Amino acid sequence: MNKVITSKEAILAISCKMAAKDGIQALNMRSVASACGVAVGSIYNYFPSKADLIASTIEMVWRDIFQMDEGYKDIYSFTDCVLWIFDSVCESAAQFPDFFTMHAMGISTSDKETGRRTMDRYLEHIKQGMLIALQRDKEVRRDAFDEAFQMEAFVEFVFGNLWTLFIQKQQSCDILLEIIRRSIYAQSHDEPR
C-alpha cells in the first residue's frame, strides 16, 4: 500500500463517516487505514490505540452534534435553549443513528471508560450552557427557585428528561417544555416561541 500523507483531522473525518454508516463497532485500526488509503502504521502515528481512535471519533461526533459555543451565544430563554438542544440532536440523529446507545453497546470494555469520559465532558458542557441560559432568562419567576428547588437540580432534571427523549427517539419535546413553563414561569408566560 502506498503511504499517503494525511492528517489527524482527515483520519477523524473518515472515522466519523464510518461510525455514521456502520456504527462505532466497525472502527478498528485496519478498517480506518484502509478507508484512508494509508498504512496501518500511519494511523498509529496519530492514535496510539484503538481506544484513542474511538474516543477521538466520539469527541468529533459530539462536536458536530453540539456546536455549543455558537448555539448558546444568543439564547436568553431557558425553553429556547432546551428546544435548541433537542432540535440539534434530532437533526444529527439522521447522520449518526443510535449515537446515544452506541457508547454502551458498541465499545469494548477497555474502550468504554475512555468513551464515557469523553461523553461526560460534553454532557457537562451542555448542562453548563443550560444553567447559563436559565440564569439569563428574565421571564423566570423570582420565587421559582429556593433551597429546596435549586437551579442546578432543575437543569439536571430537565437534561435527564431530554436524554430520555433522545434515547426513545421522540420527535417532540413539547411536554417537557410545558412542564418547564408551568414550573418556573408566571402563568401568563407566552406559548413557545
Where are these regions (language model features)?
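Short, hydrophobic secondary-structure boundary micro-motifs
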Residues: N28, D98-H103, R142-D146, P192-R193
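Short helix-capping/turn signature of helix-turn-helix
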Residues: F47, H103-D111
